[in-house]
Amino acid sequence: MSLDIAKYPTLALAENPEELRMLPKESLPKLCDELRQYLLTCVSRSSGHFASGLGVVELTVALHYVYNTPFDHLIWDVGHQAYPHKILTGRRDRISTIRQKDGLHPFPWRGESEYDVLSVGHSSTSISAGLGMAVAAEREGKGRRTVCVIGDGAITAGMAFEAMSHAGDIHSDMLVILNDNEMSISENVGGLNNHLAQLLSGKLYASLREGGKKAFSALPPIKDLLKRTEEHLKGMVVPSTLFEELGFNYIGPVDGHDVHTLTQTLKNMRDLKGPQLLHIMTKKGKGYAPAEKDPIGWHAVPKFDPASGTLPKSQSSLPTYSKIFGEWLCETAAKDSKLMAVTPAMREGSGMVRFSREYPQQYFDVAIAEQHAVTFAAGLAIGGYKPVVAIYSTFLQRAYDQLIHDVAIQNLPVLFAIDRGGLVGADGQTHQGAFDLSFMRCIPNMVIMAPSDENECRQMLYTGYHHNGPAAVRYPRGNGTSAVLEPLEMLPIGKGVLRREGEKIAILCFGTLLAQAQLAAENLNATLVDMRFVKPLDEELVLEMAAKHQVLVTVEENAIMGGAGSGVNELLMAKRRWVPVLNIGLPDLFVPQGEQDEMRSELGLDAAGIQRQIEAWLA
């Protein structure tokens, strides 16, 4: 799909930042309007992250206009908002391929463009990486500048504050731009603050400020008085105290949709020494009324008709696993007031909207703080409550030490509802749930369950919730299989289920690839086992299958290395059972983006691929 660039005459003149910087500043508002419309048209035809990009159009234009990218380093935290950046950095004609197999990466990606200096996807990493680049630039001595753009959600994470504390301590030259799009820090936006921001970022103010510090450095009482006076004056109109205490010079807030003010402020700040923080106020979804009204709903969108102002409903009548979890959560809370649900800023994605409204006293959104979420849950468990941590597989990686040190070592009854296990699709390498079975399986005291359908998912959630120790239920992104939902009951811990009896080959399946493995088993006349438990492994059943069959095949949507299949290998070797085993799962690579079914087919994890791998191995 390509758009007629003639409909965007100003944007047509800015194929890359070098061309952008040749435009007169008077044309920048027109460029922003066209860029926003181009983004709307592209995403509506191809799907993708939407509202975040609309909110940073003016900022993106101003940054590339003022800074000498790619020589100067521009870092986008998370990367949802980087579509305008990609459009302006030579990728305009390919933007419609974003998040698709073999298309543009969903986030800034080092291998894709020299303008993407940091590969991202997870939040709150930009300031740490930016500080490292700033230190390297100082050692390089070529005047390279470093700019980090971070949102008001991502900046709440501990890692961001750790980085700012370090930056303030070593006084490196860098600019952090706080993109505040939810009015959560300050509402002081207007002409006075825009004027003040330009004044405070100007060379005269900076020279007076630094000169005053030097002149009175030998007179502590006067120096302290000047500092208090400055903070008092700034504090009247800006929330600077926190960032100043961390060692940053605070400028703002600035209207993030006034491209001329942004450009002038950035020019003023470009050569300032030490760590600087520019606070801008933006509207997520800016320029498209439905997205402005519901920025969460329009965060990531399928193809849609811009004229209708509505998103198409899912064509599947089957509930998602996230919804299955959310319904179970409400069902359980209705019977047990001890249930406490914890999520690190993933309420919508984890299916917890209904629960948060119906049981607000039992619901905790701890923001982007995965480490805190897990240890907070440990504290709830110690206090006699029954915490359920709803978290994506890829984000649980960020709390691995807490999982071990604060939960598992103490054998605390915390249930982990791990969403997005396995291949997640369009978000690519940074979001695949490829490693959770591997990194959890080695932790003592853990019970790890992998359901084959939505009914098993419910039963496992119930089992894990009532288990007196740490437990994890790991389920995929996507819809269920129309399985009949049976009454909830405790599953016997560490026991699998024989689904089909065959000959010679026994397929041991962990998780929702069971339906694909079933088709392969029927074509191969193989035995099929729904293993259910990754840990503790059903050793008796595995050894029985080894005794009755010539070969074993393990199937899982997790990294082969260290995964469930590795557990089968370890058991057989420990018991001296010399049975050949084929492990089928995710290979030793970071799986790129693509539709889930596309990637399963490419990796040999659909029915045909499983059968093909087995036949090739036996040949």
UniProtKB/Swiss-Prot annotation:
Catalyzes the acyloin condensation reaction between C atoms 2 and 3 of pyruvate and glyceraldehyde 3-phosphate to yield 1-deoxy-D-xylulose-5-phosphate (DXP). The lineage of its organism: Bacteria, Pseudomonadati, Pseudomonadota, Gammaproteobacteria, Enterobacterales. Thiamine diphosphate binds at residues 80, 121-123, 153-154, 181, 288, 370. The keyword Magnesium applies. GO terms for molecular function: 1-deoxy-D-xylulose-5-phosphate synthase activity; magnesium ion binding; thiamine pyrophosphate binding. Mg(2+) binds at residues 152, 181. It catalyses: D-glyceraldehyde 3-phosphate + pyruvate + H(+) = 1-deoxy-D-xylulose 5-phosphate + CO2. Keywords: Isoprene biosynthesis, Magnesium, Metal-binding, Thiamine biosynthesis, Thiamine pyrophosphate, Transferase. Binds 1 Mg(2+) ion per subunit. InterPro entries: Dxylulose-5-P_synthase, THDP-binding, Transketo_C/PFOR_II, Transketolase-like_Pyr-bd, Transketolase_BS, Transketolase_C, Transketolase_CS. Belongs to the transketolase family. DXPS subfamily. Homodimer. This is 1-deoxy-D-xylulose-5-phosphate synthase. The gene is dxs. One of its GO terms (biological process) is isopentenyl diphosphate biosynthetic process, methylerythritol 4-phosphate pathway. Pathway: Metabolic intermediate biosynthesis; 1-deoxy-D-xylulose 5-phosphate biosynthesis; 1-deoxy-D-xylulose 5-phosphate from D-glyceraldehyde 3-phosphate and pyruvate: step 1/1. One of its GO terms (cellular component) is cytosol. Its cofactor is Mg(2+); thiamine diphosphate. PROSITE patterns: TRANSKETOLASE_1, TRANSKETOLASE_2. Gene3D superfamilies: 3.40.50.920, 3.40.50.970. It comes from the Bacteria. Its EC number is 2.2.1.7. It comes from Yersinia pseudotuberculosis serotype O:1b (strain IP 31758).
